[in-house]
Amino acid sequence: MAQRAFPNPYADYNKSLAEGYFDSAGRLTPEFSQRLNNKIRELLQQMERGLKSADPRDSTVYTGWAGIAVLYLHLYDVFGDPNYLQMAHGYVKQSLNSLSKHSITFLCGDGGPLAVAAVVHHKMNNEKQAEECITRLIHLNKIDPHAPSEMLYGRMGYISALLFVNKNFGEEKIPQSHIQQICETVLTSGEDLARKRRFTGKTPLMYEWYQEYYVGAAHGLAGIYYYLMQPSLQVSHAKLHNLVKPSVDYVCQLKFPSGNYPPCVDDSRDLLIHWCHGAPGVIYMLTQAYKVFKEERYLNDAYQCADVIWQYGLLKKGYGLCHGTAGNAYAFLSLYSLTQDAKYLYRACKFAEWCLDYGEHGCRTPDTPFSLFEGMAGTIYFLADLLVPTKARFPAFEL
């Protein structure tokens, strides 16, 4: 872990240190808000220049044009500037011109561009176009009957696109029956694989991606279980307690002494502190388990995640969401939202302060340096989210 991160130079929380960032009610100080706003404007200009050389055919939310649309949609929600909505419209239109026709998910498939387009059209009062996008999104389910179950390329990634639409419309545009049908397929496939690979003595559910049993949020168990525990999926009480809870407990048993988690089952290397692999993604499963099952041990494990992220979360890989400092900071905001403990808001502010020196630490340059999940767009999204900390949610994942 240590060799993949910069040493954390910041003192941990105390009340007097935090006063430079927010007041006792958790409202950011005008000075810190201004610093965030200035950086958002500066990075947006850099990003727009950089996007001129981006891949014109990448339609995805993860690294492509739909991700830039998600950023501008978010900026519109935060600042209310209609120019941001127009920018979102332009970018999502570009993404719809180059759909993959084979992947269905929100982050890496056609589900993302269609879901984002539906929401953008809805906010622009283009209800006919919004309905067309929703119809196409619902029909995507037929494209890949053999999809895995994980977030980036699988069924949960499709479900996240459906929930994104319902959340932003404030009503059930995607029928609950459609969502539950896919959810049942995820549960059944997890039971089948656990039996087939003889995991049933340890866990009633198991999932794989490319013959690996991944643990983290992007490809693995933590991301799948986080969604299965969401009230909006309406998993039955019996299945929550008999299938999901013992499967969550199995993931908890994989924890390293550091408080971190392995990238895969049976991987003993304690290396990665990323949203995609490790504690910064597993923490969402733990906080959701605490909300649903009311057992203190899940919250204690989440606190351990936060501590290891604070120590090793300023990543040499960069400032992005998937495997960068901004993505790691969202773990603190998630805990702050749950507990209202000012320590976690302070830690998020300090990671944001690191991001205010974007490009000055000698981090490696991502393959897609201006994208939402690997690059600058994700950092801008985080800095804007931090302006109203209680509303902050990890984009395209956290509900």
UniProtKB/Swiss-Prot annotation:
Keywords: Acetylation, Cell membrane, Cytoplasm, Membrane, Metal-binding, Transferase, Zinc
EC number: 2.5.1.18
Modification N6-acetyllysine, positions: K142
Residues holding Zn(2+): C276, C322, H323
SMART domains per the UniProt record, alphabetical: LANC_like
This protein's record includes keyword Protease: no
Chain positions recorded as glutathione binding sites: K317, R364, T365, P366, D367
UniProt catalytic activity: RX + glutathione = an S-substituted glutathione + a halide anion + H(+); 1-chloro-2,4-dinitrobenzene + glutathione = 2,4-dinitrophenyl-S-glutathione + chloride + H(+)
Pfam families: LANC_like
Cited SUPFAM superfamilies: LanC-like
Class in the EC hierarchy, top level: transferase
GO cellular component: cytoplasm; plasma membrane
Keyword Acyltransferase in record: no
GO terms, molecular function: glutathione transferase activity; metal ion binding
GO terms (BP aspect): carbohydrate metabolic process; peptide modification
Membrane topology label: Peripheral membrane protein
Tissue specificity of this protein: Expressed in brain.
Residues the record lists as N-acetylalanine modifications: A2
Cell compartment(s), UniProt: Cytoplasm; Cell membrane
Assembly and oligomerization: Interacts with the C-terminal of STOM. Interacts with the EPS8 SH3 domain. Interaction with EPS8 is inhibited by glutathione binding.
Function: Functions as a glutathione transferase. Catalyzes conjugation of the glutathione (GSH) to artificial substrates 1-chloro-2,4-dinitrobenzene (CDNB) and p-nitrophenyl acetate. Mitigates neuronal oxidative stress during normal postnatal development and in response to oxidative stresses probably through GSH antioxidant defense mechanism. May play a role in EPS8 signaling. Binds glutathione.
Similarity annotation: Belongs to the LanC-like protein family.
PANTHER family on file: GLUTATHIONE S-TRANSFERASE LANCL1 (PTHR12736:SF5), LANC-LIKE PROTEIN (PTHR12736)
The name this protein goes by in its record: Glutathione S-transferase LANCL1
Lineage, top ranks: Eukaryota, Metazoa, Chordata, Craniata, Vertebrata
Name of the gene: LANCL1
